[in-house]
């Protein structure tokens, strides 16, 4: 049985990693995450670490995972909140998954502006179609927290809203 340790991290260059996570990382051999995650954590990895970039198509990534029994994955924020842990559970239902979440970007925003988080309708456009976003607009949701990516940026989202008559 494969074991995945999925560690949620922030975008902060000076990562806070608990002693438990630092110990896990120091003993790890195989690590994975996006290119940005690698940039953020490479200083913590052992010298002989193997890194598997999470890139699309994901089938190639999961083929590489098959070669290893334990993989430490770095993911953004809460790995279950529209995150990579969901993908691992879907693709490898028999895998053992141990999570170390941190705050996600929408939680951080809510905390910064003192907004009760449950009042925000949340959705992800990260590698996803516009459907959930369009539905939220059609429903008239007042507060929409959107996870973005390199293609569906805040500017792209604003342009789409203007195109459909929101100003």
Residue locations for each model-derived region?
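Beta-strand/loop-alpha-helix module characteristic of Rossmann-like adenine-cofactor folds
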Residues: 2-7, 107-167
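Class I S-adenosyl-L-methionine
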Residues: 1-103, 107-108, 129-130
